[in-house]
Structures are given as C-alpha cells and as structure tokens.
Amino acid sequence: MPGGEGENRVGEGIQSLKQLHALPWDEKTENEMLRSRLDEQSQLICMLKQRADETQIKWQHLERVNGELERQSGEAAQRFQSERERGERLEERFAILASNHQQMIRFKDEYKQQNEELRQLCDTMRESKYPELLHRDRCIQELRDQLGDTETRLKEQEMNYGRKLDTLSAKVEQLEGEKRTGSLELGDLTHRLKVSEETRHEAQEKLARLEEIKKAEKAEADKRLEEIKKEKQELLNLCMERGRTLQDRQREAAELSVRLQEAQKSLEKAEESYQRDKAAVDADIRVSDLQRKLEDGENQFEQLRRDFEAYKKHSGDLLTKERELNSKLRHLIG
C-alpha cells in the first residue's frame, strides 16, 4: 500500500508540472493592450485640438457680428446726420416764409395808414373855402374815383395776397407738419442711434468678455496640454519601464520554464530510477526516498507557482496604474 500511494503522488506531480509547462505566454495580447492605450492617448490629444478649433471659430463669428454692428451704427449715424440737415433746411424755409408773412402784414398796415391820411385830407379840404371846396370836391371826387380804383386794386391785391397768404399759411402748416414729422423721425433716429450705440457697447463688452474667456480657456487648454504632455511622458516612461519589466519577466519566465523542464526531467529520472530499482531494493525504503524526492519536487513546484503569482500581481498593478492615468486624462479633457 505505501508503494502504490507513492507511485500515485509521483504521477500527480509529473502531471501538474506538465500542465504548468503547457501554460501559454501571450506576448501579442500585451502588445495590443499597449497599442490600444497609445491610441487612446492620441484620441484625447485630438479632442483637445478640436475644442481649440471650435473656440477659434466662435471668436471669428463674434468678430463678424461686431463688424456688422459697427456698420449698422455708421449707417444710423449717417441717417441721423441727413435728417438733422433736412430739419435745419426746413427751419430756414420756415423762417423765410415767416419773414414774408410779416412783410405782407406791414404792407397792409401801410395801406390802411395811407387811406386814413387821405380821408383826413378830404375832411380838411371840406372845411376850406367853398370855391376851393367845389374845386377840391371835384378833386376829391377824382381822388375818390382814384381811391376807388386804388381800393379796388388794393382789394384785388389784398385778395391775391390773401390767397397767397393762405397758400403760404398752408405751406407753413405743411412745413410745420414736415418739421414735426422730421422731429419725430429725428427723435426716432436718435433713439435708434442710442439703442445702436448701447447694442454696440454691449457687443463690445461681450466681445471683451469673450476675449477674456478665450484667453482663460486658451491658458487652461495650454495648462491642460502641458499636463497631458507630462502625463503622456510619464505614461511613456511607465510603458518603457513596463516593457523592461516585461522583458525581465519574460526572461524569468523562460528561466522558470527551463527550471520546470529540469524539474520534470528530474521527476522523470526519479520515476525511471524508481522503476529500475523497484525489484532490487526494499519497497519501503525506496518509497521513502521517492517520497522525499517527490516532496522536494513539490516544494520546487510551489516556489515556481509563487513566483508566477507574484509576476501576475505585478502585471496587474501596472495595468491598474495605467487605467488610473487614462481616467485622469479623460477627466482633464472632459
């Protein structure tokens, strides 16, 4: 029974060594993981560049809007100046019409004064001597006739002047209406110009704020870019360090593989020696020797397994650190 149990344990140890030796080393997967992470870094840098381009496009659009507002402000100022000149011309024409109206009033007053003087002259002539009065009556009659003609002409002229005055009054009212309309238009244009100035001032303030925001975003983007470059350099250093560590681990794995092969050969030799010496040596002593060798082989196998687990843990720590760096880069970009 002890001999059969020893043979089973030797067979199980050999089978475990064969399974460990058959474990694959996937270097291609590791290279693809490294390449995938480098691609992620390139995508993050492209996203930063795209945001910088979008900020530049917004800045150009605001410059075009500011130029359009300045053009509209200039046009409003020109219209305001034109309406102001038109109002001044209307005021000049109104002053001329008012002066003509005053002249017509003075002419009418002068006519009334002359008429009154003629009447007084007639009364004075009546109080003179009779012959002279008769003579003067004739003269007065003639003068009356002349006065009638003159009055008729004056009435005609007064009517003409009245019509002209009505026409001029209508024109004056029209000009006053135009002046009021011009004043309203001038007030509207003044209000629109004021609104345009306020809009332009607000646009300039907004543009100044956007310039400050752009400068701040540019500084922040430069700062983030520097941080990303620093993180990228650290990542590259980490990748290089990991590559060197990977090469060391590959070399260690190769050494472990050689040691596993040697251990397997030792176990195979032990099994062959056990088979050769099985018939000649006492079974219990040989089994004890084989058990000791098997325990040595198991101890070597356990040591190799612990080394392999330590390597896997170190690789996992490197991968976790790399993921944390990628998450930090995404947080900076986002």
Swiss-Prot record:
It comes from the Eukaryota. GO terms for molecular function: protein heterodimerization activity. One of its GO terms (cellular component) is cytoplasm. In adults, expressed at varying levels in different organs including the liver and brain, with highest expression in the testis. Interacts (via C-terminus) with hey1/bc8 (via Orange domain). Belongs to the CCDC89 family. This is Coiled-coil domain-containing protein 89. It comes from Xenopus laevis (African clawed frog). The lineage of its organism: Eukaryota, Metazoa, Chordata, Craniata, Vertebrata. The gene is ccdc89.
